[in-house]
């Protein structure tokens, strides 16, 4: 259940977006925010950037921002929501451990699956081990299932969803 110990100079980056039309992936995406966790010598720093309307540049938002987003859902209905880019202090609501900013997502079990690389399709953890990026990982690692995959057991799907989306706050540890 541990998160990797990243060296100083590491950057964890995640971009948030809404599809323009969920029925047509070729319609593109509306970029909203890119979040960075930057590993410094003395710990992690959280930084949020909000994308402009032209979708060609993002600007640092220390105080956060609210973005009105509209899209078409799978049924063809027009939807809208007020998306909130967190301010620096709000980042700590999820990413704090012992009063310090810390990553919560890059756990071995969450990336223990195959990805497409230039050299072919490989398990992410095996790929990292072969390149000496990591030394080891638990070989009997149980990874979450794709919660949208209706062929999977409903209990596994629910547990996977809750683990990935809720477990970092709602945890006995």
What are these regions (language model features)?
Residues 3, 22-173:
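Sequence context surrounding c-type heme c attachment/ligation sites in exported
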């Amino acid at each position: 259940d541990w998160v990797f110990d990243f060296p100083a100079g590491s950057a964890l980056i995640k971009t948030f977006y809404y599809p323009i039309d969920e029925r047509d992936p070729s319609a593109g995406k509306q970029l909203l925010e890119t979040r960075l966790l930057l590993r410094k010598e003395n710990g992690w720093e959280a930084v949020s950037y909000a994308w402009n309307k032209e979708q060609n540049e993002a600007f640092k938002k220390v105080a956060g921002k609210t973005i009105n987003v509209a899209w078409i859902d799978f049924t063809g209905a027009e939807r809208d929501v007020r998306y909130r880019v967190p301010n620096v202090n709000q980042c700590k609501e999820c990413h704090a451990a012992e009063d310090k900013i810390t990553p919560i997502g890059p756990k071995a079990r969450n990336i223990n699956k195959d990805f497409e690389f230039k050299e072919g399709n490989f398990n992410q953890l095996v790929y990292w081990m072969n390149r000496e990026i990591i030394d080891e990982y638990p070989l009997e690692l149980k990874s979450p299932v794709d919660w949208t995959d209706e062929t999977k057991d409903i209990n596994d799907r629910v547990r996977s969803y809750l683990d990935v989306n809720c477990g970092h706050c709602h945890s006995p540890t």
